[in-house]
Amino acid sequence: MVNTPERPTVQLKLVDTDHLYYSWRWEHELGAIQNIMVPGESVWPVLGELAAALPTPLPGETVDQALERALTGPFMDREREIALTTALAHALIPYQLAQEMNALLEQGLRPHVRLQPSHFTAQVPWEALHVDTNERWVTNCDLSVLPPATVRNAPERRVSEWKPDGDVVAVLDPKVPGAGSALGSVLGPVAEGSPLSSMAERLASRLTPGTAGSAFRRGDLTRDTIEPLLADASRFFYVGHVTTSAHGLDARLHLSCGAGTTGRAAVVAGHRPLTAADIVLGHRPSDPGGWRMPNRVAFIACESGGEVRFAEPVGLVAAALHTGAQFVTATRWTLPTDAGLRRFAPAATPETTVIPETVIAVDAAHDSPDPVAALNRWQRERADRWEAEGRIEDSPIVWAAFGTAFG
């Protein structure tokens, strides 16, 4: 990805204390830095409304309570959602930056916003912000997540080569040993001939380990199995469960690792989760050293990109970038499954399905020349359908959860 005259790129960084501070500069004019401060009372109330609309549990809530609240809230009703995302746009997009971007659009140039959110803006669905009638921010620009300079410019970091026809290490809804319903299947049964099955068939010659016929719900995909495969792959494609903890490096990926595996997390019900620290520092006490990630990584799981909410924003996304990834797609909040939608969303039917199309869209984006532009294109299509029809399958509660870190 290059900052060409056809694609002017701006780096936008946010920091919060009692107020919200912005700094931005265009990559073709790095010395021209703009700084503004927005009073806290102008932004905290609408951010509180956003938190109340999202499926991430609030203090004292269970996961089911959070899902029921969110799936009966603003993101399930087009008019209420537009009111919320319009208020977010007015509160959060700096007027001066908007003017600069509009000037570029009038010249036929589509900007790229590389955005580094602050602690309190970590869950803002920037792509979905409603900036005008039938227009979201992603309508007029591409958006990606700008990793912290300490991650993207780390002297030991070496970005892995992108190999368009390279192997894809696909961990698709793995079986977690000893797991109850909280770590059960996120995709449900994948029927032969279904869109997900067709996706696996398309990747068949590149899938490792295994074949298209054995791509889903495997019980043998452990850290010791996939770690050596990732070093030579082009992509890591994970669909499953992520859980957060007290700090970012303890963010946990749930594979098929039993109690006999080694790592920094304690064994829970016969299963040892893989932490971000295991990826960065290595999971074998006898063989210290971090993993080697491929160029492109996708974590389709609950709040897999939620590390910005921590004081030290180093979690799974930063771990993947630090160990070789250039593009990492992850989620900002708890992702409702199809089963969750059918259970709690009043307008859902037994046939309501959202996650398979989402998985397929992320897969296609990560095989494209520009994952950021490709994922944003899919998000624009979903936004247009939501604006036109208001179907819950097109609600931003799923497509706006995703952001791609690029660095």
Regions found by a protein language model. Give the residues of each.
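A domain-level signal for caspase-like cysteine endopeptidase catalytic cores
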Residues: T56-M76, P117-T121, V145-D250
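Cysteine protease catalytic core and zymogen-processing segment of caspase-like enzymes
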Residues: L221-R223, T243-Q326
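Boundary/activation segment at the start of structured domains
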Residues: M1-Y21, L30-G31, F120-G188, E393-A401, ...
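Helix-enriched interaction subdomains in cytosolic or periplasmic regions
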Residues: E79-R80, L109-V151, A246-H271
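Non-catalytic, solvent-exposed interaction/assembly segments
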Residues: M1-R114, S118-T121
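Short hydrophobic alpha-helical runs that function as membrane-insertion/retention elements
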Residues: F327-T331
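Caspase-like cysteine protease fold
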Residues: T261-R292, T334-G407
